[in-house]
Regions:
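A short, proline-enriched helix->beta-strand linker immediately N-terminal to the Walker B motif
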Residues: 59-63, 92
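C-terminal portion of ABC ATPase nucleotide-binding domains
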Residues: 11, 31-32, 79, 84, ...
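Catalytic Walker B motif of ABC-type/P-loop ATPase nucleotide-binding domains
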Residues: 65-68
């Protein structure tokens, strides 16, 4: 179902989309691209499902693309490969990317920092690092730490 939403995509576009998404594993499935993977792809790992979703998103070479944390379920090695290929796709399209990982945020030409449900700052990654303490704090990884100790219920 890689061509879902882009039924007119040719074989070359499908191969390119699979390559961008590092989803070449589909060729190792019993029937390749024709393999049934079950409802919602339940026979695939989370990372495999995410890579197929990314391939589906880029197969039609859209002019506008919305991606919601497109690399969150990938291991570090695959994430690095997908990022490199995704950079090429993003050069040819307008994209809105919701991201939490610093490496994904750095793919953007412009970054909008959301805080308290509002846009708190807009700029390049470097501008926000320099000029916005909250952004710098989040990019440092400090935002990944728990807010405080978890209290155990009394017994």
């Amino acid at each position: 179902n890689v061509t879902m939403g882009a039924a007119d995509a040719d074989e070359q576009q499908v191969r390119r989309a699979l390559s961008v998404a590092q989803a070449d594993f589909v060729h190792e499935l019993p029937l390749g691209l024709d393999t049934e993977v079950g409802e919602q792809g339940l026979s695939l790992s989370g990372g495999q499902r995410q890579r197929l979703a990314l391939a589906r998103a880029v197969v039609g070479e859209p002019r506008f693309l919305v991606l919601d944390d497109p690399l969150s379920a990938l291991d570090v090695h695959t994430e690095t490969l997908v990022e490199a290929a995704l950079r090429q796709v993003l050069e040819r399209t307008t994209a809105v990317v919701v991201a939490h990982r610093p490496s994904t945020v750095m793919l953007a030409d412009r970054v909008a920092l959301l805080s308290g449900g509002r846009i708190a700052a807009v700029g390049t990654h470097q501008e926000l690092l320099r000029d916005n303490a909250e952004y710098a704090w989040l990019m440092s990884g400090a935002g990944d730490e728990p807010a405080g100790p978890v209290e155990e219920p009394a017994g």
